[in-house]
Amino acid sequence: MQVTEINAQGLKREFQVLLAAQELEERLTNELSGMKDKVQLKGFRPGKVPVAHLRKVYGRSVMAEVVQNAVNEANRQIVTDNGLKLALEPQVEFPTDQAEVEKALDAKGDLAFKVALEVMPSFELADLSDVSLTKLVAKPSDAEVDEALDRMAGQSRPFTEREEGAEAQSGDRVTIDFVGRIDGEEFQGGKGEGIDLELGSGSFIPGFEDQLVGAKVGDKRLVKVTFPESYGAEHLAGKDAEFDVTVTKIQAAGEAKIDDEFAKSMGMESLEKLREAVSEAIGRDFEAASRRRLKKELLDALDGKYAFELPPSLVAQEFAAVWAQVEQDLKTRGKTFEDEDTTEEKAQAEYRKIAERRVRLGLVLAQVGESADIKVSDEEVNQALIARVRQFPGQEQQVWDFYRKNAQALAELRAPLFEEKVVDHVLGQVKLVEEPVSKEALFADEDGDDTTGGKPADKAEAKDESKTEAKAD
């Protein structure tokens, strides 16, 4: 096998591989000889089938395997001999002349094919000693703890049935049966029986709850609403609907006292212990928000430190994913690019920059992780898998089996674990300055994802919450 590099431009490399007819003949003969003891043909004793006869029966199919094995071998040799890291699977191009291919498959002519590669860029890791980042620190106040307790109490407050003939008021819980119709036809998901609804909670379609205020048990009301343009079910978004609603029960909300008894109902020893637990939970939320802000600032700093050629295939893949989210977002919200004060061409240019940033940061974090020998243990992946499984009650075994049988899905669990370890490592190389802030300041401007630097102003918002996909080896 003769391998010759015929083109090298940037991250693109191209090689020509030549398999001489004699080599094809030898490879085919070796494969057929190895089949003698395995093949049983009528008229021949086991292991006694002549190679010439095997060639007549299986020659073409075995030669196809020979060529495929040679292609795989050539790819490995090219990568190993040239010390390449591939960004894309090798693209193999065979001759277009069918007669030439036929001769090669009969081992009567040479076979030449091309292998096109796209390689990862080579770059030096930047010195981060001059980078200074601000970590925002917020501590839960007594008022924030009180607010959280009030919400908990509101969700736990008792309801008592109103007296006969009483009218439903805002804040009451009504039990209803309903049938919805659009253009006179019932629609999927538009029917319910014995459904509890707290009036004023905003849990139903806008305007639905308001039309039940003043209703009595046994009342039948025709509720007219319009589904929001952003409604999750696309076949209902923006549609006018009518619901025949029957009120079967009305309950008034009582008061839930925030005291030791309330704390015990929440599984805590006392109100003091409950306040401590709530404060700790809020503190964890604050710390997570602080981490997101700090990570965003770190990635911005890293992005400003690097400028190198990016593999076009990786950028194209990332852009396709980002753009699909943009289009889905516009469709869900019933908007156009004109509504967002832009054009499709301008939006594509801006989101391509986002894709490039993500790819660049992914490559940087991957190289940092490799340089620092950062690993993600199987135990850490298992813990992440267990956490994911718990998100699907009743389907735990199916979810577990899916991830265990799907290497790509498991890799997607491993990637963010690897990334967070790399981020921790990089944070250890920069100067951190803590700045006490309020809750409002901590959570301000949290739109956009960490790798993009936020959504472009006045553009359709990309909903992707995934972070830079640094690759874990």
Curated annotation (Swiss-Prot):
The segment(s) forming the PPIase FKBP-type domain are 171-256
Tell me which positions the record assigns to the signal sequence: none
Cellular compartments annotated: Cytoplasm
- Say which domain of life the source belongs to: Bacteria
Q: Which family does it belong to?
A: Belongs to the FKBP-type PPIase family. Tig subfamily.
Molecular function (Gene Ontology), one example: ribosome binding
What is the uppermost EC class here?
isomerase
This protein is called Trigger factor
Q: Write the lineage as a comma-separated list.
A: Bacteria, Pseudomonadati, Pseudomonadota, Alphaproteobacteria, Hyphomicrobiales
| EC number in record | 5.2.1.8
Q: Give the function comment from the record.
A: Involved in protein export. Acts as a chaperone by maintaining the newly synthesized protein in an open conformation. Functions as a peptidyl-prolyl cis-trans isomerase.
On whether Isomerase is a keyword of this UniProt record, the answer is yes
Free-text note on domains in this protein's UniProt record: Consists of 3 domains; the N-terminus binds the ribosome, the middle domain has PPIase activity, while the C-terminus has intrinsic chaperone activity on its own.
User: Where primarily located?
Assistant: cytoplasm
The ranges of region (Disordered) come to 439-473
Protein source organism: Methylobacterium radiotolerans (strain ATCC 27329 / DSM 1819 / JCM 2831 / NBRC 15690 / NCIMB 10815 / 0-1)
What InterPro entries does this protein map onto?
A: PPIase_dom_sf (IPR046357), PPIase_FKBP_dom (IPR001179), Trig_fac (IPR005215), Trigger_fac_C (IPR008880), Trigger_fac_C_sf (IPR037041), Trigger_fac_ribosome-bd_bac (IPR008881), Trigger_fac_ribosome-bd_sf (IPR036611), Trigger_fact/SurA_dom_sf (IPR027304)
Do you know which NCBIfam families this protein is assigned to? tig
Q: Which GO terms describe its cellular component?
A: cytoplasm
Provide this UniProt record's keywords sorted from A to Z. Answer: Cell cycle, Cell division, Chaperone, Cytoplasm, Isomerase, Rotamase
**Basic and acidic residues bias locations:** 456-473
Record-level GO BP terms: 'de novo' cotranslational protein folding; cell division; chaperone-mediated protein folding; protein transport; protein unfolding
Record-linked Pfam families = FKBP_C, Trigger_C, Trigger_N
Gene3D superfamilies associated with the record: 3.10.50.40, Trigger factor ribosome-binding domain, Trigger factor, C-terminal domain
